């Protein structure tokens, strides 16, 4: 990722933000304009920006020649729509999970003057996406396809979040509900579509492709998204909070994490009893017992093995694709996440 592209990408953010806080469809005053600007700056550009930048990278690899200034702007704008979608999900997700930190700072709803206004802010973030698309893509042949794509992916993600939440309903802590297939279903819908398929699908639409012709690409990206979430589950427990920017709470939150699913597969009856008694409890002693069991079961080794096998399998799937340019797009995506630490 060149520094040039990242700084160009951030310039496009400033331009989109300026459009939104001067949107003629609403009568802004100083208070509302300042609120939206502060809310955007706090929640939208703070992450690694991988999803957004991937649209530009993918489009470049598909086009295989220098992009015009206009193409760079449009690819960046689509990338930012994904970052806006991500911000909308995270603002609401943090409230539902009662999280404390996100990207190394307090969650938006935890700020003294924000609180539950964050719910409406989430709705505002979601509504910014069609505003951006309308302003910059309305005249394009693929405009309707873009709107469809964002709506479809939002529905899939919200439905994945729903399975995640109802599987972890408070007062119904049943570890027996947790299996690899439940985990994969949550991950496929909650993470893989918006984090992996959406950026490449945006680039393909911009390039003039029909998404119905790229089901294989979708399948590979969903597989990659599953691998990414397993990494996330692993880092939640074994990653360093300073590096990942948040304190993992999957154990306390009774999450259907890959680690607990694997632990249930490998544990003997005594160890399962320990898991049932301690998983999903907020007190540090219970969390420590679960982590200790993860170490005893060598889940670090099990994860390493999974990581290497997944990488091999995904590479094989990619190499069956007829287009070398599409292969490059998929391999560059995989390269960004393989053996990541955050």
Swiss-Prot record:
Disulfide bonds: none annotated. One of its GO terms (biological process) is farnesyl diphosphate biosynthetic process. One of its GO terms (cellular component) is cytoplasm. Its cofactor is Mg(2+); Mn(2+). Optimum temperature is 40 degrees Celsius. Mg(2+) 2 binds at residues 93, 97. Mg(2+) 1 binds at residues 93, 97. Its EC number is 2.5.1.1, 2.5.1.10. Keywords: Isoprene biosynthesis, Magnesium, Metal-binding, Transferase. It catalyses: isopentenyl diphosphate + (2E)-geranyl diphosphate = (2E,6E)-farnesyl diphosphate + diphosphate; isopentenyl diphosphate + dimethylallyl diphosphate = (2E)-geranyl diphosphate + diphosphate. It holds the Pfam family polyprenyl_synt. Pathway: Isoprenoid biosynthesis; farnesyl diphosphate biosynthesis; farnesyl diphosphate from geranyl diphosphate and isopentenyl diphosphate: step 1/1; Isoprenoid biosynthesis; geranyl diphosphate biosynthesis; geranyl diphosphate from dimethylallyl diphosphate and isopentenyl diphosphate: step 1/1. A motif (DDXXD motif) lies at residues 93-97, 232-236. Dimethylallyl diphosphate binds at residues 102, 190-191, 229, 246, 255. Expressed in shoots. It is an enzyme of class 2 (transferase). One of its GO terms (molecular function) is dimethylallyltranstransferase activity. Belongs to the FPP/GGPP synthase family. The Asp-Asp-Xaa-Xaa-Asp/Glu (DDXXD/E) motif is important for the catalytic activity, presumably through binding to Mg(2+). This is Farnesyl diphosphate synthase 2. It comes from Artemisia spiciformis (Spiked big sagebrush).
């Amino acid at each position: 990722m060149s520094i040039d592209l990242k700084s160009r990408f951030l310039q496009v953010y400033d331009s989109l933000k300026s459009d939104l806080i001067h949107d003629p469809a609403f009568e802004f005053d100083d208070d509302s304009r300042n609120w939206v600007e502060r809310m955007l700056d706090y929640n939208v550009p703070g992450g690694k920006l991988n999803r957004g930048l991937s649209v530009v990278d993918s489009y470049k690899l598909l086009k295989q020649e220098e992009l015009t200034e206009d193409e760079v702007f449009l690819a960046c704008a689509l990338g930012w729509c994904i970052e806006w979608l991500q911000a909308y999900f995270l603002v609401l997700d943090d409230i539902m999970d009662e999280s404390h930190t996100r990207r190394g700072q307090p969650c938006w709803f935890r700020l003294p003057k924000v609180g539950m206004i964050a719910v409406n802010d989430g709705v505002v973030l979601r509504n910014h996406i069609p505003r951006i698309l309308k302003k910059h893509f309305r005249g394009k042949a693929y405009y309707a396809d873009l709107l469809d794509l964002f709506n479809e992916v939002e529905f899939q993600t919200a439905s994945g979040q729903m399975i995640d939440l109802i599987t972890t309903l408070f007062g119904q802590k049943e570890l027996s509900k947790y299996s690899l297939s439940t985990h994969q279903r949550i991950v496929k819908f909650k993470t893989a579509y918006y984090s992996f398929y959406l950026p490449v699908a945006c680039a393909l639409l911009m390039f003039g492709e029909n998404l119905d012709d790229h089901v294989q690409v979708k399948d590979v990206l969903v597989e990659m998204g599953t691998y990414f979430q397993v990494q996330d589950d692993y880092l939640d427990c074994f990653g360093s909070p300073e590096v990942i920017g948040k304190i993992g709470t999957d154990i306390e939150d009774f999450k259907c994490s890959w680690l607990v699913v694997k632990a249930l597969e490998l544990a003997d009856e005594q160890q399962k009893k320990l898991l049932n008694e301690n998983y999903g409890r907020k007190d540090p002693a219970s969390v420590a017992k679960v982590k200790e069991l993860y170490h005893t079961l060598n889940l670090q080794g099990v994860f390493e093995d999974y990581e290497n096998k997944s990488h091999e399998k995904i590479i094989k799937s990619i190499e069956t694709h007829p287009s070398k340019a599409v292969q490059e797009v998929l391999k560059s995506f995989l390269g960004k996440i393989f053996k990541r630490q955050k």
